[in-house]
Amino acid sequence: MGNDSMKTIAVIALCALPLTLATQALAQKSASPGDVDRGRYLVRIGGCNDCHTAAYPEKAGAIPEAEWLTGVPVGFQGPWGTTYPANLRLAMNAMTEAQWMANARKPMKPPMPWFALRDMTDADVRAIYRYVKSLGPAGKPAPTYVPPGGNVTTQFIVFVPQAPPAAPR
């Protein structure tokens, strides 16, 4: 092969590289039906609905999927203050996939079991995002965090162990 042929091949390869990288990036960002189905499964078995979907435990999971993950205005109170289950439908629709991947693994206030997300594979965390994103935004934002001793204006569940009542004498 001559010098001109090598230069031509090198130019073609250099021009094709950005197109190849862009195609790969788009392929990774597109939610496949398998990702959405896997995300739905992980949300269901991971207990996400237990806190992030109103009345899910009380109705033994018999809540229409269209109502899933819209947050709950009942707080969880403990030494950390009062936290609320986020409306994941609004939160994830406001994030890029990359932002979700980074945020999902950061420590969160109790009682969120953030360490479960931390320990998942990237593929599983991505599938959860793609599933929730496929549901679209719905519902209202969750109430904001209230620090310890702050004024709580909603119902809340106290997450502090209580001593048993004293036995009658």
Predicted regions and their residues:
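Flexible coil segments in periplasmic/lumen-exposed cytochrome c-class electron-transfer proteins
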Residues: 31-34, 45, 53-83, 114-169
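A structural feature that tracks compact, well-ordered secondary-structure segments
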Residues: 89-93, 102-104, 114-116
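Bacterial N-terminal signal peptides
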Residues: 11-21
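Bacterial N-terminal signal peptides that target proteins for export
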Residues: 2-13
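Solvent-exposed, polar/charged alpha-helical surfaces in well-ordered, non-transmembrane soluble domains
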Residues: 37-41, 49, 86, 98, ...
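Sec/Tat signal peptide C-region and signal peptidase I cleavage site
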Residues: 21-27
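Peptidoglycan-targeting cell-wall enzymes and recognition modules
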Residues: 81-96
